Amino acid sequence: MKDLLNLLKNQGQIEEFDAIRIGLASPEMIRSWSFGEVKKPETINYRTFKPERDGLFCAKIFGPVKDYECLCGKYKRLKHRGVICEKCGVEVALAKVRRERMAHIELASPVAHIWFLKSLPSRIGLLMDMTLRDIERVLYFESYVVIDPGMTTLEKGQLLNDEQYFEALEEFGDDFDARMGAEAVRELLHAIDLDHEIGRLREEIPQTNSETKIKKLSKRLKLMEAFKDSGNLPEWMVLTVLPVLPPDLRPLVPLDGGRFATSDLNDLYRRVINRNNRLKRLLDLSAPDIIVRNEKRMLQEAVDALLDNGRRGRAITGSNKRPLKSLADMIKGKQGRFRQNLLGKRVDYSGRSVITVGPTLRLHQCGLPKKMALELFKPFIFGKLEMRGLATTIKAAKKMVERELPEVWDVLAEVIREHPVLLNRAPTLHRLGIQAFEPVLIEGKAIQLHPLVCAAYNADFDGDQMAVHVPLTLEAQLEARALMMSTNNILSPANGEPIIVPSQDVVLGLYYMTREAVNAKGEGRVFADLQEVDRVFRAGEASLHARVKVRINETVKEKDGSITKNTRIVDTTVGRALLFQIVPAGLSYDVVNQPMKKKAISKLINQCYRTVGLKDTVIFADQLMYTGFAYSTISGVSIGVNDFVIPEEKARIIDAATEEVKEIESQYASGLVTQGEKYNKVIDLWSKANDEVSKAMMANLSKEPVVDREGKTVEQESFNSMYMMADSGARGSAAQIRQLAGMRGLMAKPDGSIIETPITANFREGLSVLQYFISTHGARKGLADTALKTANSGYLTRRLVDVAQDLVVTEIDCGTEQGLLMTPHIEGGDVVEPLGERVLGRVIAKDVFKPGTEDVIVPAGTLIDEKWVEFIELNSVDEVVVRSPITCETRYGICAKCYGRDLARGHQVNIGEAVGVIAAQSIGEPGTQLTMRTFHIGGAASRTSAADSVQVKNGGAIRLHNLKHVERVDGNLVAVSRSGELAVADEFGRERERYKLPYGAVISVKEGDKVDAGAIVAKWDPHTHPIVTEMKGIVTFVGMEEGITIKRQTDELTGLTNIEVLDPKDRPAAGKDIRPAIKMVDANGKELLLPGTDVPAQYFLPANALVGVADGAQIAVGDVIARIPQETSKTRDITGGLPRVADLFEARRPKEASILAEISGTISFGKETKGKRRLVITPTDGSDPYEELIPKWRHLNVFEGEQVNRGEVISDGPSDPHDILRLLGVSALAKYIVNEIQDVYRLQGVKINDKHIETILRQMLRKVEVTESGDSSFIKGDQMELTQVLGENERLAEEDKFVAKYTRVLLGITKASLSTESFISAASFQETTRVLTEAAVTGKRDYLRGLKENVVVGRLIPAGTGLAYHSERKRKRDADKPVRVSASEVEAALTEALNSSGN
C-alpha cells in the first residue's frame, strides 16, 4: 500500500525543455497563473492559527494546510482527493501545492515596474524618449504629461506643472488630454507604434553626423526591435495586476512563546494590499483629487518596495530598523536564490572532522573513523542486515546499529569494501581539492590523510578539517574510482608536472641517504649486488654516505619503447644503492645516483610516469615516502643555534658599505647628486653588500673541512642541518638563512618604497630596538596582505570560472591553419623558458623546417611530446607556429587539436573535457601564493641593482636584431633605436641568450663578431637617458636663455659647467612658451638636415635635461649632446602580484599608458597648443598624415624625422592591451598578455601552462565590433559575438551580398561574463537585476549550452560524462525535426535516381 502511495506522489511529470525564455508578463498571463485574488491584508487568525479567508495565506486560494484535509475538517483522507468543500471552499489536495499556487492583486491604479524604470538605462525612458527625471515627475504625481494634444499648440509628451495645466485648461478647454501617474505613462507606451518608429529611426541614423546622437538613436532602435521581435508590448512594463508569491515561499513560522517569525515579503504585500484597498474606497467615494493622488503615489511606492526595496528613495524598514528584504533581494547576491540554492546546495551523506597524518596508508586509502563510517553508510548497513536475515525489519536493523552489536561492524566492513568516498578540503581552489579514496576503518575520531596528497589539498595538520561525501549510485562510484581516485591524479592540471611529490621530512630523508661523505666508514669497498650492500649496511659495517662501487643489474626502457637489460659497476654511495632497490624496472641507475633534492625527486616521478606508467609510479611514490620517513628519522637532523654560522667577512663588508654611503651623503650635501640619485645609489650599494654577505655566508655554510683517507684536509659539502634542509628543498631558502645568519637587509615601507637604512644584524645576533621597529613595518603589512589576498584571489577565481565555464572540448579538429608563433621566452638575457617547454603538449600548426633548409622535420598536425621536443632542440629550431585556443574556429566550445595535450593525463585531450574551468582553476588556485605586491621575504625588499651593461654568459657569434645604430669615430656603435636586441648564437646557430639594448647604448662589437663568455659587449648609463647625434657638425643653441629657460651649474670638484633646462612651471613668464633646442649647422652656419629627410636636424630638450656641450662646439657622430635624468626607481614593478594579474584579465587601460604609433611613417612636430605637443606622422605612401596631441610632460622617445612603424612605442609607459590588439593584432596581444601574466607567476616560482591563459583570452576576445554593416542586419558600432557575425557573413557570402566588416574587441573578464549569451549564467554572476531586466525586455532565450545554466535547471552538465546525455538529447531533437526540401531539390534527386537506374 505504501509503495502505491509513493507511486501516486511521484506523478508530477518532468517536462522536457530545450531552452528557457524570459519575458514580460501580460496582465492576462498573471491572471491565468492565479488561483484567486487576495483582497485582505490579514495573514492568519491569531486565536485559531488558521489562515484568514481572502488573506495572504488563504487556504481557498492557495490550497490546504494539511495533506488531503480541508480547512473546516469536513473532508479528510485520500478518498476525497479533488473535492472542493462547500463550507470553506478549500480543495482537498496535497499541502505542497501551497508552494506552487499563485494569487494576484487587482491594482486600483496602474503602477510602473521599478526595474524597467530605474535599472540603467531606463527602458521606459528610452522607449518614450524622455529623461528618467521627467518620467519620475509624472509617475510620482508632480507634473502632468500631454497624452493627446488634439488641435492645440501643445506637444505630445510635454510636461506641464499645475499652473501650466490650469492655464492650458482655460485656454483650450477639453481639446487636449493631459494626465499624471502611471496610467499616463501606460497610455503613452500603448500609443507607441513600433513598426513606424523603427522605420523612422532607420532612416534617421544615416543622416546624423554627431557621434553621441547616433549612439542614442541606435540604442533606441535596438530596444524597439527587441520589443518587436520578442512579442512583448511596451505597456506591460506598467503593472495593472500584481502577482502574489505562493505562501510557502514566504512562510509564517510559529516560534516558541506564541510569537511568529515572518518573511519580510508578507509585510511588503500587506502594505500594498492596505494601500490598494484604501485607494479603491477613495475612488468609490470619489474623494478629492489631491487625496486620491497621494494614495496613488503611496501605492506606487509600496509596489516599488515590494519589487526592489531601496532602489528608489529610502528603503522601507521593519520594526528593527533594517531594510526589508524585497523580491529582488531574494534572488541576488551570495545569499540569493541563484548562488545559495541553485548553484550550491548542501548534500546528504556527508560528515566532517579534523585530519591527521596517515603515514602507513597507501596512496589510494584514507583512514575513516568507525563512528563516521557507521553514520554515513547507515542505509547500506540496514539493507545488508535485512538481506542477511540478521534483522527482520528496517526498524530492527536500526536498533541493532544503535546498540552497535558486533554483527554490525562485520557488515560495515563489508559495505565499505571497495566503496570509495570523496574527501574535500575547503577552499576547493582546483579540481584536486576533491579526491576519492578507499576508506580504511580506524579507531579515534580524526580522518587520516595520506601525506603525499597534502600538496594537492594544500592541507596541513595544524587543525585543518575535511569533509567526507559518499557517492551513492553505481555511476557515481564508478566515476569516483575511474576519474577522481587519488592514484589517477598524479599530474597537476595546471602544468602537467607531478603533484604527488614528497615534501619536507620525506625529501630530507631521501636527500640525507643519497649524500656522500669523505672518509666515511666502508669507503672504497666493492659490492657484488644490492643485497650485499643492504646486509653490510644493516650490520653497521658501512656508513650510509660511504663512497663505494656496486655491481647493478638494470632494465632500461629506451625512447622507442624497447627494453634493454645490462649489468655494470657504478661508483655510488651505500644510500643510493639502497634507494635503487625501490626504483621500478625501466629506469636507469643514473636517476638515483645524485643527491635527491626536491627538484630531482619531482623529475624522477615525472620520468617514472612517462616511462613505466601510472600503476608503477603510484607504488613507487608510496615506497619513496616510506623510505624517506624512515631515513629522516635515522638521520636525526635537528636545528640548533650553533647551526647559524655567521661569516667573518660580514663586519668588513658592512664597514666598507657604510664608508661608501658616507661618501655619497657628502656628495649629496655638496649638491653633486640629487636626492633621487643618492637614494638610488645608496639602495644599490646596500643590495650589493647584502648579496656579498649572503654569498660569504653560503660559502661558509655549504662547505666543511674533513680529513680524507690519506690524511689530507679536503673540503666536502657540509652536513650542517640548516644547510641540508634548505639545500634539499625540504624547508627554508637561502633568503631565509640569510636573515638568520647573514644580515636582514633592506626593508620596505608599506607603500612599497624601500627604507634607506638596512638592518645589518641577523636573527642570531638579535635586532636592536630600532631595527626591530623597522622590521615590524614590513611584517605587519605582510599579515594585512594575507587577509586581503585570500578574498581577492577567491574573487579572481570566481570571475575566471564564470567567463570560461562554458568552454568545453566539443570536437577533434576544427581544421584551422592559424596559430601562434612560439619563441623561447627571454628575460634579462636569460632564456627563462626554452622553446621546448613552451611547445610541449601542443599541436604544430605549420610545417617546421630545418633551419636554413627546405626540409620539413615536423609536419603540421603533430602533437609534440617529450621525444619531439628533444628532436626540435637537436635541430636548433628557434620558432614554431602552434595551434592555440585563441585561434580555434570551433563555434561552440573548442577542438582537441587546438588545445593539445590534457596536462593531467599526458595524452590528447578528450572530447567533453571542461577546459575552461580547468584553465580558470589553474590560474586562480596559485592566486593566494601571489603577493598583493611584488616582494615577499618577511617584508625584506628584493631589488636588483639597475643593469648598466651586457655581459655575455656564453661564447659565440654576435647577432644584432632590429638595431638602428650610428658608428662613432672610435669604431664603437651607438644604438639609436629602442627595439634593438643583441643575441649570442653558438656554433650550431642556436640562440643562447638575447638582450634588449636601450637607446644610447655603446656597443663594442659588430654583427658576426666572435666573443668569449664573460665579455662585456655593451654599456650605458642606467640613471640617465641620453640624446645622441646622428651626424657631425657644429652645435648652436636655440631658445636657451640663462635664467629664463636654462640655468648653469658648476661642479665644485671638477670645475665643469652643466646646463640644465628649467621646467616650464619654474620659468619666468617670458620663457613659458620658448622651446629650448640644440640645432646642428655646418661650418658655414647652414642648418643640416637629418640624413634621408628634409627635416632640419634639431633636438628639442625636455625639462630637466642636462646639456653637456657648449654653444658652437664641434661634435662627431654618436656623441651625447644631452642627458635626461631618470626618476627614482621604486621597487621593481609597482603593481605586482595579484592586482597585476587582475588588471590584465580585466583588460584595464593603465594610467598614463604608453603611446603607440597609429600608422607607419615619419615623425614631425606640428604647432603646439596649450600644454600639449602636436605629433604628426606622415606615411611614406603619401596618404593622409595622422595627428595626435600629446601632453608636454610625457617624455617622448622619438625625435623629429625618425621613422616609426605602426604599433611602435612613441612614449614610454605601461602598455595598453586594447592598443596592442588594435594596432598589432591578436597574436601580439596574446604574446603580451601571456608573458605579462607568466612574469608575475614566475616571480613566485609558480608554473602555469600558457594554454590556460590563452583559453581565458579566447573568452575575452569573443566579441567583435561591427565597422561596416554591409547587407547584414547589424548596426555599425554594435558589439556582437564573433560566432554570430561569422555565421551571418557565411550566409551573406553564399547569397553574393556584401559581408559585414568588424574589428576584434577585448573585454575584461567581468564584462565578458556579463555579456555572455546565457542570461541565467550572467544573472547568477553579478548585477542580477540589470541582466534580468535586459533579458526580459528583449525576450531572451537561454539554450542551456554552458555548465552553469544546466546546474541551475538541475541537469547533468554538458561536459565530461554528462556530454553523452546532452549529445543524445540533441540527436533525438534533430531526428524529430521535419526536414524541409524545395521542389527543385526533389526533382534533381528524382532525375539523378532515374539516370543511375537507367545505366
From Swiss-Prot:
Cofactor binding, note field: Binds 1 Mg(2+) ion per subunit.
What cofactor does this protein call for? Answer: Mg(2+); Zn(2+)
* Keyword Phosphoprotein attached: no
Query: Which Gene Ontology molecular-function terms are recorded?
Result: DNA binding; DNA-directed RNA polymerase activity; magnesium ion binding; zinc ion binding
Which sites bind Zn(2+) 1?
Answer: C70, C72, C85, C88
Catalyses which reaction(s): RNA(n) + a ribonucleoside 5'-triphosphate = RNA(n+1) + diphosphate
Q: List this protein's GO terms for biological process.
A: DNA-templated transcription
| Binding-site list for Zn(2+) 2 | C814, C888, C895, C898
Q: Does the keyword Transcription apply?
A: yes
E.C. number(s) listed in UniProt: 2.7.7.6
Which positions are annotated as binding Mg(2+)? D460, D462, D464
**Which keywords are on file for this protein?**
DNA-directed RNA polymerase, Magnesium, Metal-binding, Nucleotidyltransferase, Transcription, Transferase, Zinc
Top-level taxon in the UniProt lineage: Bacteria
Q: Name one Pfam family in it.
A: RNA_pol_Rpb1_4
Question: One GO term of the cellular component aspect?
Answer: DNA-directed RNA polymerase complex
Cited SMART domains: RPOLA_N (SM00663)
**Per the similarity annotation, which family is this?**
Belongs to the RNA polymerase beta' chain family.
What this chain does, per the entry, is described as: DNA-dependent RNA polymerase catalyzes the transcription of DNA into RNA using the four ribonucleoside triphosphates as substrates.
Which NCBIfam families does the annotation name? rpoC_TIGR (TIGR02386)
- Subunit and partners: The RNAP catalytic core consists of 2 alpha, 1 beta, 1 beta' and 1 omega subunit. When a sigma factor is associated with the core the holoenzyme is formed, which can initiate transcription.
What's the protein name?
A: DNA-directed RNA polymerase subunit beta'
What is the organism of origin for this protein?
Ectopseudomonas mendocina (strain ymp)
Which gene produces this protein? Answer: rpoC
